[in-house]
Amino acid sequence: MFDFGLGELVFVGIIALIVLGPERLPEAARTAGRLIGRLQRFVGSVKQEFDTQIELEELRKAKQEFEAAAAQVRDSLKETGTDMQNSLHDISDGLKPWEKLPEQRTPADFGVDENGNPFPDAANTLSDGISDVMPSERSDTSAEILGDSGQTGSTAEPAETDQDRAWREYLTASAAAPVVQTVEVSYIDTAVETPVPHTTSLRKQAISRKRGLRPKHRAKPKLRVRKS
C-alpha cells in the first residue's frame, strides 16, 4: 500500500526504540499493527465499493444500450406494420365494389318460407295444375292400372297353389317322422371333503427345532467382589 523499502522500515524501528524504549516498544508495535490492519480493511472496503459502483455503472450503460436497441426494433416493427396496412388498404381500394356481386336469393324467391313450408298461393297453383288434367287421360291411366292389377292377379294364382302344396308336404313329413324320447339327466354336486392339515404337529416340530438350535451349555456369569 505504502511505498516503503527495507531501509526506511529499519530506520523507523530504530527511532521508535530510542523514543519509546524497550519496555513500551512491543505494545506500541502491536498497536501500530492493529491500526495498520484497520487501515488496510478500510482501504479494501473502499476499493470494493468503487468496484461495485463501476460494475453498476457498466450495467446501467448496458441496460441503456439494450433499451435503445429494443426501441429501434420496436420502431422498425411499427414502420413495417404501417407499410403493410397501407399496402392492404391500397389493394382493397383496387378491388371491385360489392354491388357487382350476384344478387342473393331468399327462400321467398322459391315460394317457401324460412322453415321450408310452401306459401298458400303456391299450394293453390299446384292444385289447379293437377285439376287441369283431361278426364280422358284419367280414364286411360285408371284402365292401365286395372289391367296391370288383373295381370298380376292371374299370375299370382299358381304361386299360391305351389305354396300350399309345399306346406302340405312339410306337414305330412313332420307327422310321419318318429317321435324321439328325450332322457333327462340330472347331475348332483357332491362336496369333496379335504383333509384338515395337522397344524399342531407342525407347530410342535417348529418348537423342537428352535429348542435344538439353542446352545446346550451356557456360560455362568461371574460375580465380581469389590475389595474394601
Swiss-Prot record:
The UniProt entry, under Gene3D superfamilies, shows: 1.20.5.3310
Which residue ranges have biased composition labelled Basic residues? 206-228
Which GO CC terms are listed, alphabetically? TAT protein transport complex
Where is it mainly found?
Answer: membrane
- Asked whether the UniProt record includes RNA-binding among its keywords, one would answer no
What do we know about how this protein assembles, alone or with others?
Answer: The Tat system comprises two distinct complexes: a TatABC complex, containing multiple copies of TatA, TatB and TatC subunits, and a separate TatA complex, containing only TatA subunits. Substrates initially bind to the TatABC complex, which probably triggers association of the separate TatA complex to form the active translocon.
According to UniProt, the name of this protein is Sec-independent protein translocase protein TatB
Task: Write the gene name.
Answer: tatB
